[in-house]
């Protein structure tokens, strides 16, 4: 593991310095996914490996692009975004997994978030709860275009963000289970597509920093389909979501260059 703790030019957590990352960053949660995503870049180089944060930098169509893992949840994701921003990044694409909430959101589908329910704690330390967690329109459109280009089954809409994974999957065992179940049912009635753990924080932090952020996910499974006895295989291969994220960054590079 690289250790730059004595270098004041490097960000404390991600251990990256200015000039080592591109303006475009793909952000998986799982550090192990960084290698997989970096393989889609030209000439990827390992920049840093510290805690849950691994960073690679390469190029797409001749433009510097980076991949940085965030770990699980809003606190570490917000740290990664803050420190990457200080190193020059301004466009962030979160890629990860989610659980479907609507019965038509099936295992293996792609979900692209337009906004996120702020049922987590990190964003509340950035903005009052009345402020919406909304994805950047340019990034969202690039993700949708990429999913269409790949002909992948995809859904676009609101996702729910929480801090407790097992609060979602075993609410009846929680002292706050009554509230968790009632809110879950409310989110379903409102058409929420899926549940995950980072987007609300990233969207609000991006708003505070004045940068662009969007999210796309692989649907691993759908507990609502399970409850109804519907087909619900577990799908763990994130390659389709990775392809969407990489193609979306290509779309953004092309659009940004055309607008200069």
Language model regions located:
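Metabolite-binding pocket within alpha/beta catalytic cores that recognizes anionic/polar moieties
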Residues: 1-142
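Generic non-transmembrane alpha-helical segments
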Residues: 142-150, 205, 244-255
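Zn-dependent metallopeptidase/amidohydrolase metal-coordination segment
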Residues: 200-233
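Active-site rim beta-loop-alpha module in soluble metabolic enzymes
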Residues: 133-191
């Amino acid at each position: 593991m690289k250790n730059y703790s004595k270098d004041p030019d490097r960000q404390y957590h991600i251990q990256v310095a200015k000039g080592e990352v591109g303006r475009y960053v793909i952000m998986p949660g799982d550090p192990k996914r960084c290698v997989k995503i970096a393989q889609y870049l030209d000439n990827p180089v390992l920049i840093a490996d510290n805690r849950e944060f691994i960073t690679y930098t390469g190029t797409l169509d001749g433009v510097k692009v980076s991949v940085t893992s965030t770990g699980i949840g809003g606190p570490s994701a917000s740290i990664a975004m803050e420190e990457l921003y200080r190193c020059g990044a301004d466009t962030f694409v979160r890629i990860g997994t989610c659980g479907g909430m609507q019965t038509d959101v099936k295992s293996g589908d792609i979900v692209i978030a337009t906004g996120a329910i702020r049922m987590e704690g990190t964003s509340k330390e950035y903005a009052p709860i009345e402020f919406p967690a909304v994805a950047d329109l340019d990034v969202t459109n690039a993700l949708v275009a990429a999913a269409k280009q790949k002909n992948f089954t995809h859904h676009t809409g609101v996702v729910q963000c929480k801090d407790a994974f097992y609060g979602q999957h075993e609410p009846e065992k929680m002292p706050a289970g009554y509230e968790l179940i009632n809110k879950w049912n409310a989110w379903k009635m409102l058409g929420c597509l899926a549940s995950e753990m980072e987007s609300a924080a990233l969207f609000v932090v991006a708003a505070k920093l004045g940068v662009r952020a969007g999210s796309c996910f692989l649907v691993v499974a759908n507990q609502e389909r399970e409850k109804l006895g519907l087909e619900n295989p577990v799908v763990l291969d994130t390659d389709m979501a990775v392809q969407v994220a990489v193609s979306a960054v290509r779309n953004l590079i092309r659009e940004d260059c055309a607008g200069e």
